[in-house]
């Protein structure tokens, strides 16, 4: 559970839940957190397209993903993985809307949270076609961040309309400390991943928040979070 100082909430969930039942999870979230900060859940146990990075596949604009043995890779065009990610996100949104409606919370002044990987973590964990991390290519890094921001903005606005509620965005950045500290592994020992410049990272985060609009949170469960960068 995350605790915030902003007056719109005093508690929320991180986002990821066990199990595969979207409606049951949504009912629990709305029942327990409707008076705090309810959120759309992620159910990674459902498999491909349901985890944090897979969720991004449903949000990216004009960018597709596919699976590889190590995780996800950028793809030339949308395929089964992207379609599955979109379908799972639609299911989660439907489940939250049904629970929200059943609880009588439409236009009730409550706030809802959505989660998405942040631009640094997304680029650090998704591969290019050559197998290297997308973060190693400055152009790919910028394009991914822009696509993510546009997609999350549309996702936020769409859910706000469906629930008739304010929606805030949580960017998950578990890979941010490693990306800044040069701790990301390369394809081989001879191709290390250089640390990303702090100004570049801050600029991408700021751009995402600006594009998304409204309130935004950053969540990182990894040690070594650079607080000075985020202030």
Predicted regions and their residues:
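An active-site-proximal structural segment forming one wall of the substrate-binding cleft
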Residues: 82-105, 140-167
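Alpha/beta catalytic barrel-like cores
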Residues: 1-117, 121-136, 214, 229
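Active-site loop segments of alpha/beta catalytic cores
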Residues: 147, 151-231
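A solvent-exposed, charged loop/short amphipathic helix patch at secondary-structure junctions
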Residues: 127-141, 184-195
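Conserved active-site and cofactor/substrate-binding residues in soluble primary-metabolism enzymes
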Residues: 20, 24, 87, 91, ...
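Residue-level signal for functionally critical sites in structured catalytic/ligand-binding pockets
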Residues: 19, 39-52, 92, 110, ...
């Amino acid at each position: 559970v995350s605790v915030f100082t902003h007056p719109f909430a005093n508690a929320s969930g991180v986002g990821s839940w066990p199990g595969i039942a979207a409606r049951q999870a949504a009912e629990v979230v709305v029942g327990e957190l409707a008076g705090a900060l309810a959120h759309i859940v992620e159910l990674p146990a459902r498999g491909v397209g349901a985890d944090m990075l897979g969720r991004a596949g449903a949000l990216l604009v004009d960018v597709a993903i596919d699976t590889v043995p190590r995780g996800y890779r950028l793809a030339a065009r949308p395929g089964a993985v992207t379609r599955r990610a979109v379908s799972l996100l639609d299911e989660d949104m439907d489940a939250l809307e049904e629970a929200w409606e059943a609880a009588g919370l439409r236009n009730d002044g409550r706030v809802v949270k959505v989660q998405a990987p942040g631009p640094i973590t997304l680029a650090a964990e998704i591969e290019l076609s050559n197998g290297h991390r997308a973060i190693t290519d400055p152009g790919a890094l910028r394009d991914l961040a822009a696509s993510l921001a546009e997609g999350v903005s549309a996702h936020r606005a769409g859910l706000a309309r469906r629930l008739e509620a304010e929606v805030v965005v949580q960017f998950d950045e578990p890979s941010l400390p490693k990306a800044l500290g040069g701790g990301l592994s390369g394809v081989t020992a001879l191709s290390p991943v250089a640390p990303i410049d702090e100004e570049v990272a801050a600029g991408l985060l700021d751009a995402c928040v600006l594009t998304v609009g409204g309130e935004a949170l950053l969540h990182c469960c990894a040690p070594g979070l650079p607080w000075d960068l985020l202030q």
